[in-house]
């Protein structure tokens, strides 16, 4: 399967890319590198055992996202391109809203335009706040 991983050069995204590559999937990594480094890409490929395509870009650019999804014949999107620092989100709420909410909506709109129907969204355990017991209970 041809999979686009947004935020794919971040910590969780890069580990996901390695697993996808090891299982024979074709991986396209999209990242704006605001919280990651380009130097992780050769590591992803070495551990994954094959090459991945890297595109530096932003999920908020809907026209470019539609083009990427179409041009690379993407079949599924795994979305990790969210800002997650709790303290910073309080200091910069509009920036976080723009990236996390507006960006995700633009990504989904681009997916609809390109006919991509498979979507996995990753959140953060921080949405549960400080819990006294692990594992967290979601009910």
From Swiss-Prot:
Residue intervals passing through the bilayer: none
Gene3D superfamilies: NAD(P)-binding Rossmann-like Domain
Pathway: Carbohydrate metabolism; galactose metabolism
Function summary: Involved in the metabolism of galactose. Catalyzes the conversion of UDP-galactose (UDP-Gal) to UDP-glucose (UDP-Glc) through a mechanism involving the transient reduction of NAD.
Protein name according to UniProt: UDP-glucose 4-epimerase
Lineage: Bacteria, Pseudomonadati, Pseudomonadota, Gammaproteobacteria, Enterobacterales
Binding site for substrate: 124
EC numbers for this chain: 5.1.3.2
Catalytic activity line of the entry: UDP-alpha-D-glucose = UDP-alpha-D-galactose
UniProt cofactor(s): NAD(+)
GO biological-process terms attached to the record: galactose metabolic process
GO molecular function list: UDP-glucose 4-epimerase activity
Subunit: Homodimer.
Organism: Klebsiella pneumoniae
Enzyme class: isomerase
Sorted UniProt keywords: Carbohydrate metabolism, Galactose metabolism, Isomerase, NAD
Record's keyword annotation contains rRNA-binding: no
Residues given in the record as NAD(+) binding sites: 11-12, 31-36, 58-59, 80-84, 99, 124
Signal peptide: none
A Gene Ontology cellular-component term: cytosol
Family assignment from sequence similarity: Belongs to the NAD(P)-dependent epimerase/dehydratase family.
Active-site residues, as the UniProt record annotates them: 136 (proton acceptor)
């Amino acid at each position: 399967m041809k999979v686009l991983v947004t935020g794919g050069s971040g910590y969780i995204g890069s580990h996901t890319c390695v697993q996808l590559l090891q299982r024979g999937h074709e991986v396209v990594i999209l990242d704006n590198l605001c919280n990651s480094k380009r130097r992780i890409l050769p590591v992803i490929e070495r551990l994954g055992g094959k090459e991945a395509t890297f595109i530096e870009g932003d999920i908020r650019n809907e026209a470019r996202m539609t083009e990427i999804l179409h041009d690379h014949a993407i079949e599924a999107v795994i979305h990790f391109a969210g800002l997650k620092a709790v303290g910073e989100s309080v200091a910069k709420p509009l920036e976080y809203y723009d990236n996390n909410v507006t960006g995700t909506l633009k990504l989904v709109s681009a997916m609809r335009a390109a006919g991509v129907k498979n979507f996995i969204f990753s959140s953060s355990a921080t949405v549960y706040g400080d819990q006294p017991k692990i594992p967290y209970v979601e009910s």
